[in-house]
Amino acid sequence: MANKGFFIITDISGYTEYLTESELDHAHEILQSLFDAQLKHIKFPLKISGFRGDAIFMYTPELCFVNPQTFLETLENLYIVFLETLRQMQFNTTCPCRACRNINKLDLKMCIHYGEYIVQKLGDREELLGADVIVPHRMLKNHVIEQTGVKAYALFSETAAGTLRLSELSQPLIPHTEFYEHLGEVKMQVFDLAPVWENAQERKRNFVSKEDAWVSLEKDLPH
């Protein structure tokens, strides 16, 4: 029996170029850290279905779905933790190798679709099957950057955006359309992740704990 749910792929932008232009040992460690940072924050209602090279494929069964706002915040938090990990590695490294110098070429994009699937058992593994399962993988190949200038984004199919009522929950979305062989025209909505990071940094600037401060000053005042 077919189920319904959301399919989510997080994909490291610039992965291929970065890997081919960098020393493998350090590049592997850096990419592993970025994957691990995401994996630690992938929690219910998200379930990991598999890995595709530079991408993590997840899904949320409709029965496990919480609410649109929580779902969107989960995706936003994944981006924040990804970029925090990347920036920390940039800040802390003194290594002059290409892998460490080129960390800033990496970013994250997400593709989200909603539809039907069935679960197929393969030994001790489960795999999702269905035409809708294919859609987010195809959405990874797009012209979003060229046509919108948005480099870090969550790309929602129109079906996913409508089901989530994104127009009521988030910042203005950018309409986008791609044409894929066998799928035809796929209408989408682009959610810019840059403001998500900026807002997170603004909240951090408003409060710095003593433990996180680089410099602290304590002074006894006269009674």
Where are these regions (language model features)?
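A generic fold-level signal
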Residues: 1-2, 51, 103-105, 128, ...
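Catalytic NTP-binding/metal-coordinating core of nucleotidyl cyclase/transferase enzymes
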Residues: 1-77
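Context-gated lysine
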Residues: 4, 40-43, 47, 105, ...
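Catalytic beta-strand-to-alpha-helix segment of the class III nucleotidyl cyclase homology domain
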Residues: 64-175
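Intrinsically disordered, glycine/charged-rich C-terminal tails and inter-domain linkers
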Residues: 145, 149-223
